A protein has these predicted regions:
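Histidine-centered copper-binding motifs that mark active-site loops
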Residues: 47-292, 312-314, 324-380, 462-466, ...
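Active-site pocket scaffolds in enzymes
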Residues: 117-119, 125-130, 134, 263-275, ...
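Extracellular Ig-like/FN3 beta-sandwich strand-entry sites
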Residues: 150-152, 238, 301-303, 462, ...
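Extracellular low-complexity Ser/Thr/Asn/Gly-rich intrinsically disordered segments
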Residues: 1-35, 42-45, 501-626
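Short solvent-exposed strand-capping/beta-turn motif centered on an Asx-Ser/Thr pair
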Residues: 106-110, 244-249, 381, 416-420, ...
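Short acidic, flexible loop segments centered on an aromatic residue
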Residues: 117-121, 248-262, 426-432, 545-555, ...
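Short, surface-exposed ligand- or partner-binding patches at beta-edge/loop junctions that are enriched
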Residues: 153-158, 297-312, 474-485
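Short, surface-exposed loop/turn segments at beta-strand-coil junctions that are enriched for proline
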Residues: 145-151, 294-300, 468-475, 579-585
Length: 626
C-alpha cells in the first residue's frame, strides 16, 4: 500500500483502537470497519501519477477562459470541474515588473464569477473582488502596471457567497513576477525542471465522484496541482519549489520525510533578504513559500516525500481536529501524510549547487512609521454553523464601506482572535510587514520575515502588521480584507475599504453647463427633488467628495449638491442633487465651480397650478327655483 495511505490508515486505526479497547463501542467499531474498507479501496489506486505542471503564458496580453468541464480524478465516473484554459486550475502567467499587462478574461461558465489577482498592487476597479462580477458569456478586460517584486502570486475566484464552490471546482492559477534583482541571482528558474509550482489542496467526493461542497467539510484526498497521488522527478541538485496553499481551510506543516534541511528564500510578496534554514514550515490558506532543497546529497533513483506533518498540532490548527467522523472530520485530519512523492534523477546542465547568502535588500516599514492604528477582532462562531465568524460583530455587506484610508498613509493593523479557531487574514492592494505577535516583535518567525499579504492568527492571539497604502486611490471602488478560508468569507467574514486621495485635487478641462440634463422640472410652491447631470472633458481620474450646497439665485429656495464620485480620465458627467421649494416661478440659477472650471446652470420653475380644481362659472341664474 502507498506510504501516504499507510500513514492515514495507521493513524486512524490507532486512534480508534485506543478509543475502543476498554469499552464496547459499536459506533467506533462500525467506524473502524468503514475505515478498513476505505483503506483497501485506496490501496487499489495507490500508484503514483505524474505531477501535472501547469502550462505557461507570458508577455503583456493574456487570454483566459473560465469554463465548466470534467476531469478523470478517480476510477469510475468523471468529476465535474472548472478551470482556466484547462480542466482543473489554469496556466502559470509570467509577467515582468514594470510592464503593463492586459487581461482578457472570458466567462464561459453558466455562473457569474470573478478573478482576483491575489497579492497584486493595482487599482481597485481592476482587483477582481466581489464588485468586478463577470456574468456568463461576457468578457472582462482589466489592465495595470506590474509594481510587485519578483515572487509567486496567484489568481482565483472571489464572487461573494460563491467563492467556496468556484474554488472547490478548480478555478485558479499561478502568477510569477520576474524582475532584474531576482534574475541576477544564481537561483533555479528552469520552469518544470528545477523550478516547480506546487498548489496544495484536498477534496472530498460523493458516491458519484463529485466534489462535496459544504462550508464545514475538509477534503479527504490530496490533489497536488490537481493530481491525485502525485509524484515528480527532480534532478540531483538544488531545486526550487514554489508552494501555494490553495486549500479551502486546511493548513500544512511541511517538511521532508528524511527530515532534511531546506532553505526558505521567499514568501507572499517576494524574496527574503537572506535565506532561512528550516526542517518545517507552516503554510496556511492563501500563503506562498519558495524553498530551495538540495537533492545533490541524494543518489539517482532515490525517493523522498514532501510531507504534511499535521499530527499533534496546537488546538485550533485548521485540519488538526481529531477523528474522521462528525462535522469537521476528515481522513487527513490530525495525521502526517504525503503531499508529493519525489524521485531523484540525473543532474541537469548548469545546475545550481549553492544557496545565495544574500537575496534582496528590502527596507520594511516598522511600527514607528505608522501614523494610523486600527484594531480588528474576530468574533462570532461560538454557537456553531448558525453563528458565522465575522470581524467586529459585523457581517459583510457589499453596500457598506468599513474603513476609509488616506492615500500614502502608513497604518498599523492589529487583528485579535479571541475565538475557538485559527484563521488566516488577507488584505487586498498592499503587501505588509508583520511587526509583532501578541505585542512581541521577536515572536515573528524568520520564515514570515518578508513582505506578506496573508497571515495566520491562531486562537487566543493577536498579530500586528504595517502597510503603506500608496499609488492608487478610488473613493467609489473598494478593496477587501477577509479570512482566506473560502467558507468563512462566503459566510460574511470580510470587510472592505476605500483609499481616498486628499492631496491631489480633481481637475477638468471643460464643463458643459449649457447642455445640462435635468431629471424633472420643479413647480413653484411644491417640494422638488431631482438631479442635474453636467458633462465634462479632461478629467484627471481623481476621486472627489460630496460638495457643499449651492443656493439658487433669481428664483430662490433651491439648493444643488454635488454627489461624490471619481473623475474619468477624459470625458464624463457630474451629478448634482437639487432639492427645495420656491415661492415663485421663473429661472433658478446655480453657479457651478468644479475642477478649475465655472459656469451657470439654469433650471426653469413653472407657475403654481390653481389650488381649487372645482369648475368655475361667471354667473348663476336661480330664477324660478323653489
Amino acid at each position: 500500500m502507498n506510504f501516504h495511505y499507510c500513514n492515514i490508515g495507521s493513524a486512524i486505526i490507532k486512534e480508534i483502537y485506543f478509543q475502543t479497547k476498554n469499552t464496547f463501542n459499536m459506533k467506533k467499531i462500525a467506524e473502524f470497519i468503514l475505515i478498513v474498507s476505505i483503506l483497501f479501496s485506496m490501496s487499489s489506486m495507490a500508484q503514483y501519477n505524474n505531477l501535472w505542471i501547469p502550462d505557461t503564458l507570458s508577455g503583456t496580453s493574456f487570454n483566459l477562459t473560465i469554463k465548466d468541464t470534467f476531469s478523470q480524478l478517480r476510477t469510475g465516473q468523471q468529476t465535474i470541474t472548472s478551470g482556466v484554459n484547462n480542466k482543473f486550475w489554469g496556466p502559470t502567467l509570467f509577467v515582468n515588473k514594470g510592464d503593463t499587462v492586459h487581461m482578457n478574461v472570458r466567462n464561459s461558465m453558466n455562473d457569474s464569477t470573478t478573478i482576483h489577482w491575489h497579492g497584486m498592487h493595482l487599482p481597485a476597479v481592476m482587483d477582481g473582488g466581489p464588485h468586478q462580477v463577470i456574468p456568463p458569456g461576457t468578457l472582462w478586460q482589466p489592465y495595470w502596471q506590474i509594481n510587485n517584486l519578483a515572487g509567486t502570486y496567484w489568481y482565483h475566484p472571489h464572487l461573494h457567497e460563491m467563492t467556496l464552490e468556484h474554488v472547490t471546482k478548480g478555478i485558479g492559477g499561478f502568477m510569477i513576477v520576474r524582475d532584474p534583482q531576482e534574475s541576477a541571482l544564481a537561483l533555479p528558474r528552469k520552469y518544470g525542471i528545477d523550478d516547480i509550482p506546487i498548489a496544495l489542496t484536498s477534496r472530498r467526493y460523493d458516491a458519484t465522484n463529485q466534489f462535496v461542497v459544504t462550508n464545514t467539510v475538509y477534503g479527504d484526498y490530496m490533489l497536488t496541482n490537481g493530481t491525485p497521488n502525485a509524484q515528480v522527478s527532480l534532478p540531483k541538485q538544488y531545486v526550487r519549489l514554489r508552494i501555494l496553499n490553495a486549500e479551502i481551510e486546511r493548513g500544512y506543516n511541511l517538511g521532508f520525510s528524511d527530515n532534511r534541511t531546506f532553505y526558505i528564500i521567499g514568501n507572499d510578496g517576494g524574496l527574503l533578504n537572506t535565506p532561512v534554514s528550516a526542517t518545517r514550515v507552516k503554510l496556511m490558506v492563501g500563503e506562498r513559500v519558495e524553498i530551495l532543497v538540495n537533492l545533490g546529497t541524494s543518489n539517482v533513483g532515490d525517493s523522498l516525500n514532501l510531507m504534511a506533518y499535521n499530527s499533534n498540532q496546537a488546538f485550533g490548527f485548521p485540519g488538526g481536529e481529531a477523528g474522521v467522523a462528525g462535522q469537521f472530520g476528515s481522513l487527513l485530519n490530525n495525521i502526517d501524510f504525503t503531499v508529493l512523492h519525489i524521485k531523484v534523477t540525473a543532474t541537469t546542465a548548469n545546475p545550481i549547487t549553492s544557496v545565495p547568502a544574500v537575496l534582496a535588500n528590502n527596507s520594511y516599514w516598522t511600527s514607528a512609521d505608522a501614523t494610523v492604528s486600527r484594531n480588528l477582532t474576530i468574533t462570532g462562531g461560538q454557537a456553531g454553523a448558525n453563528q458565522p465568524f465575522v470581524f467586529d460583530n459585523t457581517a459583510f455587506n457589499i453596500s457598506n464601506i468599513n474603513k476609509t484610508i488616506n492615500l500614502n498613509d502608513i497604518e498599523k493593523w492589529t487583528v485579535t482572535n479571541n475565538n475557538i479557531f485559527g484563521h488566516t487574514f488577507h488584505i487586498h492592494d498592499v503587501q505588509f510587514k508583520i511587526v509583532a505577535r501578541n505585542g512581541i516583535a521577536t515572536s515573528v518567525g524568520d520564515f514570515e520575515s518578508g513582505w506578506k499579504d496573508v497571515m495566520y492568527v491562531p486562537r487566543g492571539e493577536n498579530v500586528s502588521f504595517v502597510a503603506k497604502f500608496d499609488d492608487y486611490s478610488d473613493a467609489i471602488h473598494p478593496y477587501m480584507y477577509h479570512c482566506h478560508f473560502s467558507n468563512h468569507e462566503d459566510d460574511g467574514m470580510m470587510g472592505q475599504f476605500v483609499v481616498n486621495n486628499t492631496a491631489v485635487s480633481p481637475t477638468i478641462a471643460t464643463l458643459a453647463c449649457s447642455n445640462a440634463f435635468y431629471s424633472a422640472a420643479p413647480t413653484a410652491n411644491t417640494l422638488f427633488n431631482g438631479t442635474a447631470t453636467i458633462g465634462y472633458t479632461g478629467g484627471n481620474g481623481i476621486a472627489y467628495t460630496t460638495g457643499s450646497a449651492i443656493s439658487s439665485t433669481g428664483v430662490t429656495g433651491l439648493t444643488a449638491t454635488l454627489q461624490a464620485g471619481t473623475l474619468n480620465n477624459g470625458a464624463g458627467n457630474l451629478i448634482y442633487t437639487i432639492t427645495g421649494t420656491t415661492a415663485t416661478s421663473g429661472n433658478a440659477i446655480f453657479s457651478i465651480s468644479f475642477g478649475g472650471q465655472t459656469c451657470n446652470i439654469v433650471l426653469s420653475v413653472s407657475a403654481t397650478p390653481p389650488n381649487n380644481t372645482d369648475p368655475i362659472i361667471s354667473s348663476l341664474n336661480c330664477t324660478g327655483v323653489q
